[in-house]
Amino acid sequence: MSEGAAAASPPGAASAAAASAEEGTAAAAAAAAAGGGPDGGGEGAAEPPRELRCSDCIVWNRQQTWLCVVPLFIGFIGLGLSLMLLKWIVVGSVKEYVPTDLVDSKGMGQDPFFLSKPSSFPKAMETTTTTTSTTSPATPSAGGAASSRTPNRISTRLTTITRAPTRFPGHRVPIRASPRSTTARNTAAPATVPSTTAPFFSSSTLGSRPPVPGTPSTQAMPSWPTAAYATSSYLHDSTPSWTLSPFQDAASSSSSSSSSATTTTPETSTSPKFHTTTYSTERSEHFKPCRDKDLAYCLNDGECFVIETLTGSHKHCRCKEGYQGVRCDQFLPKTDSILSDPTDHLGIEFMESEEVYQRQVLSISCIIFGIVIVGMFCAAFYFKSKKQAKQIQEQLKVPQNGKSYSLKASSTMAKSENLVKSHVQLQNYSKVERHPVTALEKMMESSFVGPQSFPEVPSPDRGSQSVKHHRSLSSCCSPGQRSGMLHRNAFRRTPPSPRSRLGGIVGPAYQQLEESRIPDQDTIPCQGIEVRKTISHLPIQLWCVERPLDLKYSSSGLKTQRNTSINMQLPSRETNPYFNSLEQKDLVGYSSTRASSVPIIPSVGLEETCLQMPGISEVKSIKWCKNSYSADVVNVSIPVSDCLIAEQQEVKILLETVQEQIRILTDARRSEDYELASVETEDSASENTAFLPLSPTAKSEREAQFVLRNEIQRDSALTK
């Protein structure tokens, strides 16, 4: 079914399912890697990924990058603006060049003028001119003889109109100029113009009209524009006169003329195939320098001169290169001169002056040089900062085990049995009384719960113990008493009664605690008492040896005085134990029904194998107590004693041992910080909870006294 469903599913669904499966597998792998697999807290579990945090070095690197990029970007923008400014200064000031031959003919003051005759014929153009001429009388020659005529002196004011060139078919003939109106002045005789005809010129000229009777006919003049020599409307110059060649002065018939001024048109004239035109060297104008008062007429260092003509004198200016106009007041772009003669200019003429150009080039060069220097400094600073950042990152990678605490350390150390350092936690809690007794009989029980720092040695008596990590009482006691004691899993810590006091420090040990007198009903004798020896790794060694006890019974209860030798000694003091006699003042017997608060010594890794050999009454029994962590065996010889007395002695020994251990552990804890330790002590007094260090060490006597005073104050506060 599943295979069929898979086959029936579309490919998109299959791919989606495969993708989801892959994602699930990846997520499971990631979770296993993060948690260390199923055994997340095991020894071989992988460490959780370190939390990513924003490093200051990374941020600083980014800031340095932007600090270097932004000035470079601004510098390039400034460079572009500088180049644009240079282009605007150099190219923007140069006007666009327009050739003069493409300018409209009606424009004013745009074409340059020439004060000398051209060296070549003008271009073939037909020009219509309006002239005012004075003709001299001519005498016609008879019989076809050639006649000569005097040159005409013509003063013209010209306006040129450009037309398309006109050519005669079949031969080279210059374009003719036909005067539209001719006025004869001071004519003494009828003015006649001989017309020479030739077979070659049999056709009439364009625009010619038949002669009107009574009007003089003018000779056909060479057809080249006179306006080419005087095109400026402001220039009043005389046009050059010319004479016809002898080939053109052939005999012609003339018509009658009248003395009145009439409009004439040139007749059809014939001439040989080849003809030439000669210019006259005579001129009617005179060039004179301007007077001193007229020197300011020409601007921009132009040269002023006066032209005298028949109509009067006229002032003109010869402008310097780069200027034009009537008074040289118009600036001519220098591109004209560059285009006309580019070999004489090297590009510096684009500027108004060479100094300005040099200043601008210098300023732009300084800007570019400054930008390059700033870029170099930024690059050097960037690489230096990058190197320093790498060094800082390498220093940060050095492990700092003393400053970091791992959350996984406690679980890992709890499961590893070979680790020396471990966290020992002291848990205090109160237990409700089983039977209604007085306040003096209330007990506080506490237990050490913590990881074992050392391997355990199997004990044959482990099966009879109720709790694994606690020692059992001596097997000498009765089953009723043992059942009343072994139901607890922690030792009892009894607050001192109003009559109980802590004695002063006698040597390195505490004095015996005083127990209040409580009447007891009956006693049950028992054999032997346990004697224990603490391991040498802890900061205290306890040797307990009891002397033979004398049993005394009374009607009200059991009262006895015993001498007990107890020594509590720091390991750094001496290696051999010594004993101090302690006077047992008041020992109180407990009944089997009220023996529910007998403390059990904690086993902070302490397991002992006790082999007891009970003997007969009045005979000493030998008990061999072997430490589970040391191979030495303590041989203790004790007499046959009462079980109640043994219980009382054991209670006292255990109380002193626990108090000494608590004092030393608390002292080691407070050595790091006294103030913090005092706060923790108050919290432990109120909440019955305290945390002990990994491996406690012995401290100085001054610290021990300080801790002792705090303990006394706390006990007195609890008693009140």
Swiss-Prot record:
Q: List the biased-composition ranges (Low complexity).
A: 127-148, 187-205, 250-271
Q: Which InterPro entries match?
A: EGF-like_dom (IPR000742), Neuregulin (IPR040180)
> What's the protein name?
Pro-neuregulin-3, membrane-bound isoform
Cytoplasmic compartment segments: 382-720
Q: What does the entry list under GO cellular component?
A: extracellular region; extracellular space; glutamatergic synapse; plasma membrane
Q: EGF-like domain: from which residue to which, for each copy?
A: 286-329
Main function: Direct ligand for the ERBB4 tyrosine kinase receptor. Binding results in ligand-stimulated tyrosine phosphorylation and activation of the receptor. Does not bind to the EGF receptor, ERBB2 or ERBB3 receptors. May be a survival factor for oligodendrocytes.
Polar residues compositional bias, start-end: 149-163
The question of whether Cell membrane is a record keyword is answered with yes
- Name the UniProt key words of this record, in alphabetical order: Cell membrane, Disulfide bond, EGF-like domain, Glycoprotein, Growth factor, Membrane, Secreted, Transmembrane, Transmembrane helix
Q: Which residues cross the membrane?
A: 361-381
GO molecular function (one): receptor tyrosine kinase binding
The record ties this protein, via SUPFAM superfamilies, to: EGF/Laminin
Species of origin: Homo sapiens (Human)
Let me know which tissues express this protein, per UniProt. Answer: Highly expressed in most regions of the brain with the exception of corpus callosum. Expressed at lower level in testis. Not detected in heart, placenta, lung, liver, skeletal muscle, kidney, pancreas, spleen, thymus, prostate, ovary, small intestine, colon and peripheral blood leukocytes.
